[in-house]
Amino acid sequence: EVDAVIAGLVSGRVLEPLDQDSFRFRHELLREVAEELSPPTLRRHLHSRIADALVSTPGNPDWPLIARHHERAERYSEAASAYGAAAANARQRGALGEALTYLTHAVSQAENCPSGGERDRLEIALRLGRAFLAQAAEGVASQNAAADFERCLALCSSDLADDDLFSTVMSLYPYYTMRADLDRAERLVRSVRAQLTGPRECFLPINEFGLGMLAWYRGEFGYAHEKLEVAANTLTEACSRDLEAMLFMPNDATAGLYTHLALARYIDGDLVGVAAELDRAERRCAEIPFPKGAFSLAYVRQMEILIRAEAGQLQRAAEAAVELTTLGEQHGFDSWALVGKAQHATVGALSALADNANPATLQPHIAMLTAFVEAWRSMNAISLVTFYDAILARLLIASGELPEARERLRIGLELAERTRMHFYDAELLRLRAHTTDDIGARREDLEAAWELARRQDAPIFQLRAATDLFALDGAPAQHAVSGALNGFSEGSSWPEVAPARAMLE
């Protein structure tokens, strides 16, 4: 019957064959007339039948086509699910932009569904998936992701025992930390902790990781190290799998834990420990499918560059910055591509400082780094920005622009005070001592930096302040150098240890 109808349409020059089983209207106007002549109820019925036939066809379903037929049949829930399946396929191919487009269509279809719990759960799942991809493409400070998270919170119940709310709240953590909203992130982690009972108890190590990471940003390095070690020693592979199924954030929690352990070990001047943790993190990223594996590796590289720069390993830092930029450009991670370029510029500036470049040579580095720092501030992506404030201050000091350097340090310290992000305060204070010719003021800042680093359990920062005090006061400051060196192991390979020990000979 169908063959006879099609044959008649072909002979009537309404349709033309493409191959043995495919046909198309000879002209677009004929298609439009055919559609307009059909009553709406018949059109919906036909689209519905076509969608069902496409779903039942063997092989890989054409989910975008199926979704469009469901949409025209006004079967909105099925349309949303089909667009979601299309997004999943695009994501597996690494097409983040395409996946985001399909998820946006899916959310629109879910919004057309009748109100009720089923519709809310569908919309939450789709928005969490879209927020995940938005963070991967735009960075964890993505405003688009934040809007989806906020909508999910509005749709969820107020009971953290609800899995949808639990997933949403947990997935907000990197958004708050990237914006240095440490107090809100802490409240989130502690509210979740109260719900880690029964089947969720295995998530406690990741909660410890969250507390340790926040403590690191606050400059509470001893407590941070303790929490991170507990997390690493108690986390199981089964827990990691269960957790990743509930989290809608592009960073893998386990790789992040190892990365932050590397940061904790760098504060201790433990370069052997740093290398071991970075290696663990990289191996973990290699086990994870796209996009989370590649995105998490980008995070590892970002932190590695910071550590290598601090250790004076500028060649490796430059290589890692190139790798980070390449990761971002290859996979559509625009934020990581930008960070990679900024960090490459940072390493270039540090290399110029190491070469004792003249003030004129430093000016392009100052301009470039200032532009990046101000861009991060404008986007409120400020979790590490005081580190870059300090590098800018070093460049300004080296070029003889002391008032500008002092102002940059003031900006950094003011942000630290406002956010409680004190991880680099000791360095900001130490550098401020180099912006004045007043010996008393210099000594006061250096002593404050030394004491703060001591309280924070930060041997590398304490040692820098101590050696600057020794340069200022000579032998009377040997006790400060000796006290700082006590924080390092006997065989420490941190590059500033050997010169400091020579001061005591």
Label each residue range with its predicted role.
Residues 33, 68, 85-92, 108, ...:
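Tandem amphipathic alpha-helical repeat scaffolds
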Residues 144, 151-154, 346, 407-505:
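C-terminal non-catalytic interaction modules
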Residues 57-61, 73, 93-95, 113-117, ...:
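Short coil/turn linkers that connect adjacent helices within long alpha-helical scaffolds
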Residues 369-381, 385-419, 437:
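Eukaryotic tandem repeat interaction scaffolds
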Residues 63, 71, 75-172, 178-182, ...:
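Flexible inter-repeat linkers and adjacent short helices
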Residues 1-101, 105-113:
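Short secondary-structure boundary elements
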Residues 43-44, 60-63, 97-108, 138-150, ...:
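Helix-turn-helix repeat elements of alpha-solenoid scaffolds
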Residues 6, 47, 51, 70, ...:
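Inward-facing hydrophobic residues that define packing positions of alpha-helical scaffold repeats
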